[in-house]
Design a protein with these regions (language model features):
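Sec-dependent N-terminal signal peptides
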Residues: 4-13
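Sec/Tat signal peptide C-region and signal peptidase I cleavage site
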Residues: 16-20
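Subset of outer-membrane beta-barrel
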Residues: 21-314
Length: 314
C-alpha cells in the first residue's frame, strides 16, 4: 500500500502557495499528469529553466520553436530516460529533420511512462488479492517549427496521448505552441510556450482535462570567451492545478565538449535542487559527434530522479 501511495504522490502534485484554497479545488481534476514531467537531462540539470533555450531536440517538450534552430544540414536523434522513485520510468525518442526544400524543421517523438505491475486490492483484501494490473501513459507527437526572421521563430506540436489502466483505455489529442525571440544582446533570448492545449479523458462518471501549462522565460550568456561560456536561465510557469512556479538554471561549457549544470525548482512540492553534467565526444565510424548528459533532481521526501540523454547528429 505504501508503494502505491508513493507512485500516486509522484504523479499528482498537491496544492501549495498563496492561492492554495482555490488551487486545492482543482487538484485531482486533471489527468495526464505525466505530460508535466520534463524530459532531457540537460534541461533537468538546469532546473527545468529551458523554455528560452530549447536548442536541442528536447525542445519538442520545452518549446517547439526551438526545433527551428537545429542545423538544417543535420538529422538529430535523441533518446531520453528518466527514473523516478517507486519504479516509475519515462522514456522518449525524438527524431528532428529537415523535409526537402520546405522552410523550417520537423520532428517526431514518442514517449511512454511505465509503472511496475500494481497489486489489485479490494475492501475485503486490502493487502492484495494476488492479482496485478498494469498502468501507463504514452504519447506520440509531430512538430513543425520555422524561423520567420533572424530573431523570431515559432513552432507547434500535435500530440496523441493515451492512457492504459488495465482494461480501461482512453485517447485524446493535445497541442503545444511556442515562440523564441533573440534580443540580440549578450545572447539574450525570450521564450514562451503553452503546453497541452485541449484534450479530455472520459472516465466512467466524469471528464478529466489534460493540464494546460503556460511557460515564459529568458536566458543570456553571463560569460562568453573563446573557450568558456556560462549560460544563465530563468523561467516562470503556471499550471492549472497548482501554484505558480519558478525555475533557475546555469550551464558552464568548456570548449563545447564538457558541461556542468545546476538549477533550482522553486514552489514545487516534490522537486528542488538539480545538477548535471555532460560530454560531447566524436564517433569516428559515423564521422559525427554525440552528446551524453546526466541530471540529478532532488525529489524531497520521495527520493531522487535520474535522467540520462544521448544525442547523435547525422
Amino acid at each position: 500500500m505504501k508503494r502505491t501511495l508513493i507512485v500516486l504522490g509522484a504523479l499528482a502534485l498537491s496544492a501549495s502557495g498563496a492561492h492554495a484554497a482555490e488551487i486545492f479545488e482543482k487538484v485531482g481534476t486533471f489527468d495526464g499528469q505525466f505530460l508535466k514531467i520534463g524530459i532531457g537531462a540537460r534541461a533537468a540539470g538546469m532546473g527545468g529553466a529551458f523554455v528560452a533555450i530549447a536548442d536541442d531536440p528536447s525542445a519538442v517538450y520545452w518549446n517547439p520553436a526551438g526545433i527551428a534552430h537545429l542545423d538544417d544540414e543535420e538529422t538529430n536523434v535523441m533518446l531520453n530516460h528518466l527514473t523516478w522513485p517507486a519504479d516509475v520510468s519515462v522514456d522518449q525518442a525524438v527524431l528532428a529533420f529537415k523535409l526537402g526544400k520546405m522552410p523550417g524543421q520537423w520532428a517526431v517523438n514518442a514517449r511512454a511512462l511505465t509503472i511496475d505491475d500494481q497489486p489489485v486490492r479490494d475492501a475485503f483484501r486490502p493487502d492484495g488479492t494476488g492479482e496485478f494490473f498494469d498502468a501507463g501513459y504514452s504519447s506520440f507527437g509531430a512538430t513543425y517549427a520555422r524561423s520567420f526572421t533572424d530573431k523570431f521563430s515559432a513552432g507547434a506540436n500535435v500530440n496523441l496521448v493515451r492512457l492504459d489502466l488495465e482494461d480501461f483505455k482512453q485517447e485524446t489529442i493535445t497541442f503545444d505552441l511556442g515562440t523564441l525571440y533573440n534580443v540580440g544582446v549578450a545572447g539574450m533570448k525570450i521564450g514562451f510556450a503553452i503546453q497541452n492545449i485541449g484534450g479530455q479523458v472520459q472516465f466512467i462518471e466524469r471528464e478529466a482535462r489534460v493540464p494546460t501549462v503556460f511557460r515564459v522565460g529568458t536566458s543570456a550568456d553571463i560569460i562568453s570567451t573563446g573557450s568558456s561560456r556560462l549560460l544563465g536561465s530563468f523561467e516562470f510557469s503556471h499550471p492549472p492545478d497548482n501554484a505558480e512556479r519558478l525555475n533557475f538554471g546555469a550551464e558552464y561549457a568548456y570548449r563545447d565538449y564538457v558541461f556542468l549544470r545546476s538549477g533550482m525548482n522553486i514552489n514545487y512540492d516534490s522537486e528542488g535542487f538539480a545538477a548535471g553534467a555532460g560530454v560531447r565526444f566524436p564517433i569516428t565510424a559515423l564521422k559525427t559527434n554525440a552528446n551524453f548528459d546526466y541530471a540529478y533532481t532532488d525529489m524531497k521526501t520521495l527520493g531522487a530522479a535520474h535522467r540520462f540523454s544521448v544525442r547523435v547528429r547525422f
